[in-house]
Amino acid sequence: MLLPALRAVQDACIPHAVFTHTFRGYINGLHRLGAGTVSRLYGYHVTTIWDSADLNIVATLPRLDPASRRPQPDNLRWVGPIIAAPARPQREDPPLVLVSMSTNGFRGQRRTVERTINALATLPLRAIVTTAGVLNPDDLPKALNVDVVGYVDHGELMPRCSLVVGHGGHSSSFRALAHDLPLLVIPASPLSDQRMIGASIAAARAGLSLRRSASTETIRRAITTLLTTPQYRSAATQIGAEVRASDATGQAARLITGLT
């Protein structure tokens, strides 16, 4: 957030831009009530500082961001998610499911991953679970059709996948959508942007969102529904086309150079 630096830049009347890496609806809502409350104790009002910048670049799709349906400051520009260009899809049969939860190790994350593995174990598919060092793969349940690993390049896996099960992080969720993949979102933290992202994806019919406490059977039913109902893939494909066409980095660069 660099609030002291932004305050100093504004006091010096130096042209500057701020970057919103997730939904504006979250930054101006729940985040303002969480981290924003702490910032106010030090005399920094996040919304005021953000809205006073010459430019606020929001790196997400406006139609999924709840804030796009409300009036916004004149400095705000949506450019789309900044995502590396996806490789050509090579879907596997039986379908391959990628499970990727947060790298922050939120409370209860192990139980969510365990229930997800148990849900996948009885389905006619293959799955790869990446733990990113947060959990030890050897400590998780074993299943013949599920590989549990530490680190794997998701950019290599996603073209082969038919579904992603994740925690609702903005980057990983939109990376999946850029590959035309529907999502099962199981938010790891009620204070993060994850619930809002999961709800928006579900509302767009590009996936489903469950509570962190969802049972193994509930997760199993959701995975089955997403793999067997074409409308979810269709909606994800439409969003994926929008992400790939957005030229987010180019738009952001042109906006920034326009400040000079």
Where are these regions (language model features)?
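Short beta->alpha connector loops at strand-helix junctions that form conserved
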Residues: T20-H21, G168, V185-S189, S209-S213
